[in-house]
């Protein structure tokens, strides 16, 4: 089929879209069924069905040997999380790290350094303009009273998550326009290592149902879908892996279920800022216009999402369903990205260890945003992949799989409790002899 015929078909379908009011390739809701090819169709709400890839190792007939008893004098994987977050009325945020974060344990090339003792962030412009005193004016700025102060003081036990451990589940969440197919290399890799994996298609993506109402694609609606999937498959130690927009849902679940989320992996997720849809965006155009522009959008995604634009990348874009979604769903997804709660304070409150993976050729997410995320998070490790871009899990699957696996196996170095030295016995003082007496 020629490109001219493809463009003509897109224009024709766009006119039908304007006349009929619905996109011609709308996906109808599916029944909740268990398929024989490893997919499950879960009805999270009446008429709202998500396709889920759920795979894992075969059940072990004999129970594994009991783990060795820990030395009572050694705190294995125990991390003390101490942090004070102060929000001022003028929009200033001060984050003070009061404890020692174990960031140096996973350091290497392109890793993040030790967190600063205090981090100051400007959340928003103060109402009423800039109230700071001019330099050289001789006036001193009055100290502002904090709007609220958040104290974090808890202990986290961070352990190695190995394959075939019955209490470990890996959740993979894709972003806008993708599907669970983008995780194929990661799903196959970790299943071979004995891990249990869960990967859903977001509503309107892949083989999940596509409601024809924009409210079905707001952040809150999609977050509740992910909550339903998480609570259905979660076990004791759960690891969340998100890509792009999917990182926001991982953050949401980690904040909602701190006792169940053991580790988080964010791949090209961006900075720790609240979500707000752009008012001046191409995605605000009518659905029929977006449908006519779909070939151009796909080409733009290939240019921005991949470091190279060769035959291999075009095949990955097609087979991996990296950008394959109806114009209606795309428009609703972009306009529904409203999440004011997910700001810097929200991210600073997380105490779960986080691995940040960034492809250096990413034109959607600048590296400065992931660096900012690493600064805000309490336990964060940033890894940069020089030859990768936004779809780094498709471009560099071996590198990504290695980084993810190393992070799953990582645990902090045990800290032995300081041994108490025995106190010296008190010496009895002899009375001084009286004058003239012999000693």
From Swiss-Prot:
It comes from the Eukaryota. Its main location: cytoplasm. One of its GO terms (cellular component) is cytoplasm. One of its GO terms (biological process) is negative regulation of NLRP3 inflammasome complex assembly. Residues 54-75, 122-148, 415-439 are annotated as: Disordered. GO terms for molecular function: hydrolase activity. Its EC number is 3.-.-.-. The active site is at 244 (charge relay system), 362 (charge relay system), 390 (charge relay system). Residues 169-271 form the AB hydrolase-1 domain. Pfam families: Abhydrolase_1. It is an enzyme of class 3 (hydrolase). Keywords: Cytoplasm, Hydrolase, Inflammatory response. Residues 58-67 have a biased composition (Pro residues). It is found in: Cytoplasm. Belongs to the AB hydrolase superfamily. Interacts with NLRP3 (via NACHT and LLR domains); this interaction is enhanced in the presence of NLRP3 inflammasome inducers, such as ATP, nigericin, silica, or alum. Interacts with ZDHHC12. This is Protein ABHD8. It comes from Mus musculus. The gene is Abhd8.
